[in-house]
């Protein structure tokens, strides 16, 4: 991924850094929400789910070599570099939006009710004949998956083809603010989806 320091990240997510200040100039090598994927140099984002709280895995990921972690909890309980935020999920989106804007890359955003994935695959296939393309993989098309896809972008990529799925009011605006698409493709919308677009 393109260079991004903990200082950049702290500012992007409006957080407060806790730990050795010399770490602020260090660059992360990736971002993970899954403790099993938190490799050396990564920033860990501990999300809270219905049954699992990612904060419980912070000691594990730091042992694996992660550079720092976000946290919603009392940072004084941690001995590792951390960025305290109100919401790790929102911080994930804010950091992704910041990262996307650091890249000189064209983004094609695709949304709709039916046909998003096939349209994404077709567009990515055509563009890849000329450009280095990154596309959304699997179902990584929501407020968590989209940021993770964006973090996979490098300076070698020329185009990103990003699928954006929406299921609640305001989500389209939220996803667009993260991806900042240069080109928008809207495929078929059903009457059930229309109320969620705004």
PLM region descriptions:
Residues 91-192:
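Phosphate-binding loop of NTP-binding sites
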Residues 193-198:
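A short, hydrophobic C-terminal helix/tail in secreted or cell-surface proteins
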Residues 1-94:
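N-terminal leader/targeting and accessory segments in enzymes
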